[in-house]
């Protein structure tokens, strides 16, 4: 066996299974950045770094962004674009967000049985496809307003994979141990192939409705998305304040999103409108009946306990009884205690999904530190702040929407709220205008970002899941199926920012439903 040359072995190990062109591109970035920083302009080197980082987010299907983005961030610190102290300042300033990801996501993991039970009953009890789609969309929206969207999508993916596997094993006449549900060669007859294709289309539409539902619900509350918490902290809002502040935009968008769900199903547009095949329903109902009969008293108690913990979670968040991460920790403690999960390795599994994204979010903050130190967004913010107050809202919404549709909305939201806070602290905008800009930034990062899987973490999670190849859900198909929602949510959001945000906020203020927070000019910001 001929030994592999050292340089070839290094390239092979570098970024693992990412394609060679991608590896060489990252190498090129790492080579160009210090040259541009030292010999041309720190400002333009900083902007190139931001573009490079957005590129790594956009190429998330080629390689998880933590490694290439982390290398770029490390190099930026080493060559002096920012300092470890500034990065640490950003991280500590956003510790609530990191706590949310670590503890809340893990906490909801221990409530999966209840969520699986709910979505299973929805799928089997509701026979009308438009009504079922509406139920999935609204259930995902409600859950995402209080829980982590990734966890909600993960649960629905689990339901879909489970049901797909049940029918696939039935159609291929294989046992649970021997079946490979990704292999269709064992299917018996053309009818089973046709039925399975129809079932795939049915599951695709349900998953997309649920994914959009997480965006519709997630934009409404401060815990719905990680960037919401960053924005809420910067603006000085609690849970109820955040909901009321967003409502002039989010409530009309929610209503129009729900109408879109019904219309695309009713008129069978953009790949929607496919019904659950009758023979698949019979197989799934038989399986559910069998599982219900096997459910023990202990299993029933676990479901009841998880439902009670869910009520505690909603009350604790609504009344801000503690920081979000601590509420998540309380969920972990209660759910594991009363559901009998006491082994360390079993508890450890709950943290697996959140930790990579938590690490990536810390890298985001390093890039934000570069943006602050190099004042990269100052020209853009200066340009926007030359406009009238209403034009500022529209421009912030559109700038956020455009970037969020191609990049990660947590990163975009963090950057823009930071710049808006800086403008307020330097006296360029008033406190009421800053509060309105925070609404425009939050809705801008959350609503148009459904356009592509790059923008919404839940969409990216769905696309990279083991379910996507089973139901033939590709990147292009996701973009097409998201298109009606993208158009409606973006345009309705824009119109609301333009016409309803200011008068309705004034109405809430005059009736003492909301008030201006006591923000200190010298306070730390997100």
UniProtKB/Swiss-Prot annotation:
Keyword Membrane in annotation: yes
Biological role stated in the UniProt entry: Na(+)/H(+) antiporter that extrudes sodium in exchange for external protons.
Compartments, as annotated in UniProt: Cell inner membrane
Reactions that this protein is recorded to catalyse: 2 Na(+)(in) + 3 H(+)(out) = 2 Na(+)(out) + 3 H(+)(in)
MF terms (GO), sorted A to Z: sodium:proton antiporter activity
Topology of the protein relative to the lipid bilayer: Multi-pass membrane protein
Location, primary (coarse class): membrane
Name assigned to this protein: Na(+)/H(+) antiporter NhaB
InterPro entries: Na+/H+_antiporter_NhaB
Recorded name of the encoding gene: nhaB
GO cellular component: plasma membrane
Recorded family membership: Belongs to the NhaB Na(+)/H(+) (TC 2.A.34) antiporter family.
Keyword line: Antiport, Cell inner membrane, Cell membrane, Ion transport, Membrane, Sodium, Sodium transport, Transmembrane, Transmembrane helix, Transport
TM stretches of this protein: 14-34, 35-55, 99-119, 122-142, 146-166, 206-226, 239-259, 307-327, 328-348, 357-377, 397-417, 451-471, 479-499
PANTHER family in alphabetical order: NA(+)_H(+) ANTIPORTER NHAB, TRANSPORTER ARSB-RELATED
């Amino acid at each position: 066996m001929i030994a592999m040359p050292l340089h070839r072995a290094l390239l092979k190990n570098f970024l693992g299974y990412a394609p060679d062109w991608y590896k060489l591109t990252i190498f090129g970035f790492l080579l160009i950045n210090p040259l541009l920083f030292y010999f041309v302009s720190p400002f333009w080197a900083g902007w190139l770094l931001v573009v490079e980082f957005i590129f790594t987010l956009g190429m998330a299907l080629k390689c998880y962004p933590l490694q290439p983005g982390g290398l770029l961030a490390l190099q930026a610190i080493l060559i002096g674009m920012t300092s470890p102290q500034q990065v640490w300042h950003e991280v500590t300033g956003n510790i609530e967000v990191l706590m949310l990801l670590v503890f809340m996501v893990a906490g909801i993991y221990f409530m999966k049985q209840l969520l699986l039970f709910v979505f299973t009953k929805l799928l089997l009890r509701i026979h009308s496809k438009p009504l079922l789609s509406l139920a999935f969309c609204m259930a995902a929206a409600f859950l995402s307003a209080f829980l982590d969207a990734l966890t909600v999508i993960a649960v629905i993916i689990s339901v879909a994979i489970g049901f797909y596997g049940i029918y696939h094993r039935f159609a291929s006449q294989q046992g649970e141990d021997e079946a490979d549900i990704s292999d269709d060669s064992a299917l018996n007859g053309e009818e089973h192939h046709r039925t399975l294709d129809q079932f795939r289309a049915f599951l695709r539409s349900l998953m997309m409705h649920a994914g959009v539902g997480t965006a519709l619900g997630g934009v409404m509350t401060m815990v719905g998305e990680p960037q919401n918490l960053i924005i809420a902290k910067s603006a000085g809002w609690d849970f109820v304040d955040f909901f009321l502040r967003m409502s002039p935009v989010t409530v009309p968008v929610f209503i129009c999103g729900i109408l879109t769900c019904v219309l695309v199903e009713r008129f069978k547009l953009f790949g929607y409108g496919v019904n659950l095949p009758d023979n698949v329903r019979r197989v799934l109902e038989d399986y559910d009946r069998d599982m219900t009969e096997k459910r023990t008293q202990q299993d029933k108690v676990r479901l009841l306990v998880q439902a009670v913990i869910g009520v505690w979670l909603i009350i604790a968040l609504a009344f801000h009884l503690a920081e979000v991460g601590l509420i998540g920790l309380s969920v972990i403690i209660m759910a594991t205690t009363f559901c009998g999960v006491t082994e360390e390795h079993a508890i450890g599994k709950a943290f697996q999904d959140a930790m990579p994204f938590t690490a990536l979010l810390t890298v985001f903050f390093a890039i934000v530190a570069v943006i602050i130190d190099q004042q990269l967004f100052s020209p853009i913010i200066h340009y926007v702040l030359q406009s009238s107050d209403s034009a500022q809202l529209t421009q912030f919404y559109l700038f956020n929407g455009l970037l969020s549709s191609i990049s990660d909305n947590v990163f975009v939201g963090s950057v823009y709220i930071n710049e808006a806070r800086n403008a307020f602290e330097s006296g360029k905008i008033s406190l009421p205008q800053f509060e309105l800009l925070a609404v425009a930034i939050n809705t801008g990062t959350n609503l148009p970002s459904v356009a592509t899987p790059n923008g919404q973490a839940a969409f990216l999670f769905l696309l990279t899941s083991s379910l996507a190849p089973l139901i033939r859900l590709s990147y292009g198909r996701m973009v097409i199926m998201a298109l009606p929602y993208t158009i409606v949510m973006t345009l309705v959001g824009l119109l609301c920012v333009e016409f309803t945000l200011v008068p309705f906020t004034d109405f809430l203020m005059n009736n003492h439903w909301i008030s201006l927070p006591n923000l200190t000019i010298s306070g730390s910001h997100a």
